[in-house]
Amino acid sequence: MPVEIWTLGVGLPKLGVRQAVAAERAGFDGFAVVDSQNLSGDPYVALALAAHATERIKLATGVTNPLTRHPAVTASAIATVQAESNGRAVLGIGRGDSALAHLGLAPAPVAAFERYLSQLQAYLRGDAVALSDAGACLGSNPALETLRLAGTPQDSRLHWLRATQEKVPVDVAATGPKVIAAAARHAERITFAVGADLTRLRWAIDTARSARTAAGLDPNAIGLGAYLNVVAHPDPLEALRLAEGGVASFARFSVMHGKVPGPADESQRAVLEGVHHAYDMRRHTMTGTPQAAMLTEDFARSFAILGPSDSCIERMREIAALGLTKLIVIGPSANADPGEAAAARLRFENDVLPGLR
């Protein structure tokens, strides 16, 4: 099965659309926009605009969360992008990180996340959600019955959704076993955020398929992918310097609450724990940070893909051979040297991307 290669962008005004157009021109299969309201613009506005500026490329949130929008609102937003893009939308979602941190919140509990996924899928299918369940997502607001209306909705659903519109697939970003299992039960796809280490990726794949089997579902009837920090550069150390902000950010997902799920040797655990303790959310995804200083060359060599184009192609092919059909590439860090970052992106687009086809 062909492997989709995606890139990640931001929904900043004017910039998001330019990034989507450039990604399509470069040959990427998909373009995902971050959802972090205090750090970037609205992703659904950016995706809708990108839908009209592009023709082929798939468009996704990368990723949204279960707390800043009701599942009906999320479903309606991405279904609108689906209609505007003629069926190219994907709903990427995780438990939340920077979007919640800037509201003073931690990621959503796994049980709440799974309930959200269940409701979200119902809305996207055009199914009904019980009003009691829909209202529960909004906390202690007074119930509709207090208004004593002559007539009220009997359930909650997207009435405007056309039956002929193809359902938007849900793609869960997952790292730990509980979230992987929840995603395996409810999503069309799981994109793992466990790094590029083959041992950790195999563990994540096995966890997902085991959860599907335990739920009575076909273990092979779900798409699997991975988020990968990739910077192509003749000098691996220079590649790490360009990528370190993103590498530290994604490494933190593997130790979000201070414990490392899945396989990791002693040195890997030491680095991950160092990233966890040093992480400064005010400098999220940036180079030159305390969290980036925790990264060692050995750790970066296994967790990320950094170095000459040929080695990047080889590593990405090895990862795809595990049965993954979607790879989302995170390139140079947000504040990396603009000229060097642009050169690295061109190197990936001109050398690595064609080499993966």
Report each predicted region and the residues it spans.
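Short, acidic/polar
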Residues: 12-23, 77, 174-182, 309-318
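Conserved, mostly hydrophobic/aromatic
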Residues: 27, 50, 81, 120, ...
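Glycine-rich, proline-tolerant flexible connector loops at the mouths of alpha/beta enzymes
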Residues: 30-53, 65, 196-198, 331-345
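An alpha-helical appendage that flanks or caps ligand/catalytic pockets
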Residues: 106, 110-160, 201-321
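Hydrophobic faces of well-ordered beta-strands that scaffold small-molecule active sites
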Residues: 3-7, 31-33, 59-62, 89-93, ...
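Active-site mouth loops of central-metabolism enzymes
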Residues: 2-14, 64-71, 164-175, 230-233, ...
